[in-house]
Amino acid sequence: MANKKCPVMHGGATEISMSNMEWWPKALNLDILHQHDSKTNPMGAGFNYREQVKLLDVEALKKDLHALMTDSQPWWPADWGHYGGLMIRLSWHAAGTYRTADGRGGAGRGNQRFAPLNSWPDNVNLDKARRLLWPLKKKYGNKLSWADLIAYAGTIAYESMGLKTFGFAFGREDIWHPEKDIYWGAEKEWLAPSGSEGSRYSGERDLENPLASVMMGLIYVNPEGVDGHPDPLKTANDVRVTFERMAMNDEETVALTAGGHTVGKCHGNGDAELLGPVPEGADVEDQGLGWINKSQRGIGRDTVSSGLEGAWTTHPTQWDNGYFTLLLNHEWQLNKSPAGAWQWEPINIKEEDKPVDVEDLTQRYNPIMTDADMAMKLDPDYQIISARFDKDPEYFSDVFARTWFKLTHRDMGPKTRYIGPDVPAVDLLWQDPVPKGRSDYDVEAVKAQIAASSLSVSDMVTTAWDSARTFRGSDLRGGANGARIRLAPQRDWQANEPERLNRVLAVLEPIAAKSGVSVADVIVLAGNLAVEQAAKAAGFAIKVPFSPGRGDATADMTDVESFHVLEPLHDGYRNWLKKDYAVSAEELMLDQTQLLGLTAQEMTVLLGGMRVLGTNYNGESHGAFTEHQGALTNDFFVNLTDMNNTWQPVSNNLYEISDRETAKLKWTATRVDLVFGSNSILRAYAEVYAQDDNQQKFVEDFVTTWAKVMNSDRFDLD
């Protein structure tokens, strides 16, 4: 028998060998901090997409996209000769993964090209949509990212079918491998019903945070009903929770549901069991395409995607008010699609009100509604909104256009990041607007006023940190710009120690007013000054980089409700947990670090510096391994790695560090502190900063990382 053993010492497939995380599943997974580095990016260090996209011929692209919509390809024919519905679903399912709790998901990175999204059950046949777009991506090359093209395709699809769109902004940069930091749920199977192993539901029907979709592999809700059981009122509850977690209110929810279903159709005219493997599991000859039906025709009218079959409206390639006309003026009953999926069909309907077949325009079939569509009619609050839209088509079109813009731009950050000729002039509250601040002032003079105040190093560093730490690299919200730390709700957050914060602001705000500069700048400048003072106390003269120009947001520019999701519930850098959580403190710190956009090395040096600067919450001394608090020394690392010490737990998250010889208690520490000595990777970094010859390197690296955090939301500097 031939020896089929792999002829090389390594494996290219996952079944060949176990990963470290499989051998030691409780180990800290630092991979989420190492993703998206230059080694995976084929464009090179000098490539700047945001500059390249400014060279894009937008009008030519728009013309090409309009032409593509009606250029039906025989390998994947367009329904009714128009790809609009398919392209809208592509854009929608890219943007619809966004959730407010952690800002992850969304259309901003082109992540739908990679697993798991490229193979989700809800994304069946969207691989075909991306292949249809490939000639345009190929043509426009580096001037057009996949992320921008996917989002733009849906917008132009609506425009081509008659909707007056609200606008569009370019500037989404592609990633080059799957995102490892996004938690999609703990279920072990696709479309696992409630109560399955790892279920995302508890209690009556409480959806686990930060999740927004109701099932593993769905973008929103189950179109057949809760766990596949039709009941529009129960589905309405799922819809409301899901869309709220995507930052949509009831009116926006109805608009998106109706507008998304005004055009296009569901596909379920066949046997779903005949579909081939998903893209990520398909064989090489399928070239990245999935769900191929090799037993039957499987395209055109015989396509199977969601399993439901039919269009929602009479004219599914035309923007109109037909969705409400049919939904509200007919009685509906449950039927099964050819693929066996539950769907609602009208009991009595005129033949001319039925949509025609996608291939034979002489044949007509019943329109259909999903369980979520029926919720728009039967839920009392949704019904009122639906009736309003039905009576005022222009109002509906305007609300939908604005909401579609919000959906496709929610994770792009502030308006200063928008690029292109079709950027709306209006400022929208959900964009967290911040006015431009002054940059033409004497920075050193302002710094001198701060230095002359009574504020300590701890006060200034802590306040600057608290202001900046809200930044999320996921949806680019938060940060120090705007100084919203002085406004509701942030001023009253427990994490910000309101009493201390108010005392510090009482000193800094008058300095800002007297100098005619923003409070945002003064808060950061004070933090920088404190770091410089601490470095000097450690024997090093260093200047922290500072770029003036931050503005101060007002209460009118701040949607208080939307900022609740940015409230810190933990902060490893200040050694604080609001309460005990099922997730370990070090894992929470890792998540915080990833959202801040920091690497494992930056996390290490930043935390070590914060510990010796006296920034712990409420003045706690845990992890402050130094006798020189307020001086930017490497004492945290020196004492953490000192084998003359022993470490003993005294409670779940508290440890005592004692002298090995005398047993004298020296310090206390938390899990977050000790993980930098226990995790092999973090210990390697800690040892670098503990070295006798790296004290200056520690100071320099801390300053670099500190400045990075302070400027994380300064998109005007890009």
UniProtKB/Swiss-Prot annotation:
Entry-linked InterPro entries: Catalase_peroxidase (IPR000763), Haem_peroxidase (IPR002016), Haem_peroxidase_sf (IPR010255), Peroxidases_AS (IPR019794)
Pfam families: peroxidase
Catalysed reaction equations from the record: H2O2 + AH2 = A + 2 H2O; 2 H2O2 = O2 + 2 H2O
Tryptophyl-tyrosyl-methioninium (Tyr-Met) (with W-92) crosslink, residue number(s): Y220-M246
Cofactors that this protein relies on: heme b
Class of this enzyme: oxidoreductase
PROSITE patterns: PEROXIDASE_2, PEROXIDASE_4
Post-translational modification remark: Formation of the three residue Trp-Tyr-Met cross-link is important for the catalase, but not the peroxidase activity of the enzyme.
Domain of life assignment: Bacteria
Cofactor remark from the record: Binds 1 heme b (iron(II)-protoporphyrin IX) group per dimer.
Keyword field: Heme, Hydrogen peroxide, Iron, Metal-binding, Oxidoreductase, Peroxidase
Any one GO molecular function term: heme binding
One GO cellular component term noted in the UniProt record for this chain: cytosol
EC annotation from Swiss-Prot or TrEMBL: 1.11.1.21
Active site (catalytic residues): H93 (proton acceptor)
Family: Belongs to the peroxidase family. Peroxidase/catalase subfamily.
Function comment: Bifunctional enzyme with both catalase and broad-spectrum peroxidase activity.
Protein name: Catalase-peroxidase
